[in-house]
Amino acid sequence: MKEIGALQAEYPLVNKLIATKEVFWINPHIEKYERAIKDSPLNEENVKDAEERLKRFAPYIAKVFPETKGTNGIIESPLVKIPSMKEALETNYKQTILGELLLKCDSHLPISGSIKARGGIYEVLKHAEQLALQHGMLTEEDDYSILDSDTCREFFSKYSIAVGSTGNLGLSIGIMSANLGFNVTVHMSADAKEWKKSLLRSKGVNVIEYEDDYSKAVEEGRRQADADPSCYFVDDENSHDLFLGYSVAASRLQKQLEELEVVVDEDHPLFVYLPCGVGGGPGGVAFGLKLLYKDNVHCFFAEPTHSPCMLLGLMTGLHDKIAVQDIGIDNVTDADGLAVGRPSGFVGKTMEPFLSGNYTVNDEELYRLLKELADTENIYLEPSALAGMIGPVKVCKEDEYLQKQQLTEKVKKGTHIVWGTGGSMVPKDVMNEYYRKGLELTI
């Protein structure tokens, strides 16, 4: 790896990252969709396969999780207009947001209340399906609700699943695995919230705590799983299945946009702002959206100023060969879901030609935005889920991207979607504390 001095000389923005200042970075490696997709390790067929698998599991999900009955076992979240929040953002940041502002409420996804309910649950279901098919417990033509039986639970109890997590991925994998009957262990980093650990333990999940950060929890989880042939490790840093589970969100969003009569085409661009930790969730969603909307969708990742791992990896081209700690950043943030020091190399390399840009936001801003959204729209998100909310302001204010892409006029007829990644399962007293912090910082 290059010396810090060499990185600073080659990439002046690194200086602002080191100083934990907010930055806005336009990806110089973005390519036209038709060119980018040719070199992609994944394609439309992979996403369709994931979509079909989730449909096969829908009867099981509807039976085991009654809160999904209304959507027939499809785990999906609302897409809502937030005009009052848009007004507040314009007033507070003295910046007109051109186009309409919507919020994708993955914070209110059933089962585990975060975007991780997409990828995490999907990967567990795929593993369960493979085991059940191999051992003659199931055929693809069966009604998958038969998996909700003592016989199947007893069968799955011979196997275990492990994952390393800062919290939300652990919740979705823990809850799903335990329901199927797997023995499940979640390796949790120091920044994982206490209530998330307690909730997992209450579901019968084995939680192992570390005093180190996320990368260490993943490393330990991987090591322990390698030593046990019956253990399946969900590898958040390298998993194609997690990524594809997230990417299914795109076709669902397309239907919701149609229902809201929102047009996305060359004259009506779509901008999507996704909070980013190790990269799987935002990467998968953005990839799915690019497959559908090609060059008419513009995806931006959002990271905390103290954990800008994906931005650092993409900007320097070093991907997972560099961690924020290597340039003296502490990776300590209240945005626990985004507290990742080293990005996924697989996601970074896959998304490099598709991603429009990346920006950072400080913790205090997240709390202010949390309070503002609660006041204006009565929607409560956890701090990390607000990272996307400042995106439309940044894109409109620093209009270099709009100019480069010849969008300065088109953006007026465009749509901005902020991906609200988590929050509905946060205990009331914890959420009140978040709100209080936002209030103190606003006064």
Swiss-Prot record:
Extract the GO molecular function terms from the UniProt entry.
D-serine ammonia-lyase activity; hydro-lyase activity; pyridoxal phosphate binding
Q: What is its EC number?
A: 4.3.1.18
Q: Does the keyword Zinc apply?
A: no
Where in the sequence is N6-(pyridoxal phosphate)lysine found?
116
Kindly give the Gene3D superfamilies that the UniProt entry links to this protein: 3.40.50.1100
Q: Which InterPro entries match?
A: D_Ser_am_lyase, Ser/Thr_Dehydratase, Ser/Thr_deHydtase_PyrdxlP-BS, TrpB-like_PALP, TrpB-like_PALP_sf
Indicate the enzyme's highest-level EC class: lyase
Lyase as a keyword?
A: yes
* Coiled coil (UniProt feature): none
State the family named in the UniProt similarity comment for this chain.
Answer: Belongs to the serine/threonine dehydratase family. DsdA subfamily.
Q: Please state what the protein is called.
A: Probable D-serine dehydratase
Q: Which organism is it from?
A: Bacillus cereus (strain G9842)
